[in-house]
Regions:
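Alpha-helical substrate-recognition element adjacent to the catalytic core
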Residues: 1-180, 254, 258
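C-terminal cap/substrate-recognition subdomain and adjoining C-terminal extension
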Residues: 117-141, 146-319
Length: 319
């Protein structure tokens, strides 16, 4: 946290507003889902589910997806390349990956099986957070550059049913009459084009959130910090960034984009404390807990190796 007074001011502004004014916008991969499990083993992203399963279906597809990741992943996370310079590379990566996935002819049942067997896990407290938002009728937009069908299948498996307050804005597979994936939805959503210009294409959703002036935003990439750009009704946005590995250069940039940066935090403890305060559940106690947790996170400015998980000094499977 770079400016504690600004965070406190935003918190107070959101808390003082009616909960009917609240909107939560969150990324999925490595934000609601885990970057690693409690033993330190890497978890998958929604695209990673296909990267992993591809080898069991087609060795050729597995090699193609792996080579694409090796080529483009360093570009996505290079702090010395501007977003404008990254965008055409991300578009190439996403479109090429999607084209090869569609060519393989995956069926809905195959994808459901991939999800059921994948090492895809929710962060500790994420299920409770989603159910809390459902109980208070607060819209949760899961804004993902991943594969929306994977998110849908996974949440139905984890939650039992799909809460009606959750809206997935993502790359969705379209199926033919035989439940074979034949195309991806447009427009393409990649890491650096996640903003309200995309949400505005979802007419009923855009109308539903038009009166929501307070935004709680959560993401794990620099692009995620811009997910609220263009929300005309927005008056205040509190942004929480999850930096899942130790990188001093990236940490500085995350602190520019987010109000709060949590380093290698595989829980939803801080967001849940904030929501508890908004919903007037032990408000004073929660505010005190928030302050305590954020004070402890100040050492993230000089993060140590013990506070992050880095495999062979490289960023593991971030996509």
């Amino acid at each position: 946290m770079r400016d504690s007074s600004a965070v406190e001011q935003k918190l107070n502004q959101i808390i003082s507003a009616d909960k009917d004014k609240l909107l939560v916008v969150s990324d999925f991969d490595y934000t609601l889902s885990r970057f690693h499990d409690p033993e330190g083993k890497s978890c998958l992203t929604t695209h990673g589910v296909f990267d992993s399963a591809a080898w069991t279906v087609s060795q050729e597809l597995g090699m193609i997806l792996e080579r694409l990741k090796e080529k483009y992943l360093p570009i996505e996370f290079d702090p010395h390349i501007t977003v404008a310079e990254k965008i055409p590379h991300m578009e190439d990566w996403w479109r090429t990956s999607h084209e090869h996935i569609i060519k393989t002819g995956f069926t809905k049942k195959m994808i459901q099986k991939f999800v059921a067997e994948a090492k895809l896990e929710l962060k500790e407290g994420a299920e409770e957070l989603m159910l809390m938002l459902r109980d208070h009728n607060v819209p949760l937009i899961i804004f993902s550059a991943g594969i929306g069908n994977v998110i849908d299948f996974f949440l139905r498996k984890e939650l039992g049913r799909f809460p009606n307050n959750i809206h997935i804005v993502s790359n969705m597979m379209k199926y033919d009459e035989n439940d074979v994936a034949v195309a991806f939805s447009e427009p393409l959503i990649h890491t650096f084009c996640k903003n309200s210009a995309v949400i505005s294409r979802y007419g009923s959703l855009f109308s539903e959130i038009s009166s929501r002036t307070c935004v709680l935003l959560m993401g794990d990439s620099l692009g995620d910090s811009k997910m609220d750009v263009g929300l005309e009704c927005e008056q205040v946005a509190l942004k929480i960034g999850f930096l899942n590995y130790n990188d001093e250069t990236l940490l500085a940039k995350y602190l520019d984009g987010y109000d709060i940066v949590l380093l290698d935090d595989q829980t939803m403890h801080v967001p849940r404390l904030i929501l508890n305060s908004i919903f007037e559940t032990e408000r004073d106690e929660n505010l005190s807990c928030i302050n305590c947790r954020l004070e402890s996170k100040k050492k993230s400015h000089v993060a140590t190796e013990e506070e992050s998980v880095v495999v062979n000094n490289k960023v593991p499977n971030l996509r």
